[in-house]
Amino acid sequence: MKPLYLFFVVLGTLCSSFAQTGKVMDELKLNSKILKGERKFAVYLPPDYETSSRSYPVLYLLHGYTDDQTGWVQFGEVQHIADKAINEGTATPMIIIMPDADTGLPGYTNAISGNWNYEDFFFEELMPHVEGRFRIKKKKQFRAVAGLSMGGGGSFLYALHRPDLFSSAAPLSAWMGPQTLEEMNDFAKRENMKFEEKNFNAFLEHNNPLKLVDQMSKETLNSVRWYIDCGDDDFLYEA
């Protein structure tokens, strides 16, 4: 029995050694004219990226408040989870893009102050850059967005603002940002940011998911596949 046991141990070790692994780069940079400076992002490339010439679907994975582009790599174990899912056949090989939305003013929206337009950067600079640099399929059906907490709010808004670009969205424990003037004042004080109260209603109109959903046709809303998750005891549940 012992030799047979050892045989299966060795066989398991050999099989695991053949499992392909992807590649993560978490200090990539691009220069942003919109944000007037250098921006960092991380990328996960699937196991067969270096040995194939094919193009891949893309997932834009957004981090939470106080994290940066390394959050999903270091704490979310994105490489281990993606490799395992791809090798087991439960996920298709894909490229995952993880941008930094913490350096400067944190958040994925265009700031109410008007001097930090992160959402414009995301759609006008980041997406064209990475989809030109890596072999990414550029059609809606091959593009998804997901995120946690602040990133969950970002994925919610991006899919609602641009349903023509994303086929799927997965907001996880989404923080939707300030939804009242009092919350906006608290956020501005915490981030040392100035804004004019007269601009708040327009900001809220553009960044409140309930208002955005009400303005969309059922057909447009259903053109995106939604996975929305938040635990019963999560303090963000009310959002």
Name each region found by the language model.
Residues 1-24:
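Bacterial Sec-dependent N-terminal signal peptides
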Residues 20-239:
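Non-catalytic cap/lid and distal C-terminal segments of serine-dependent acyl enzymes
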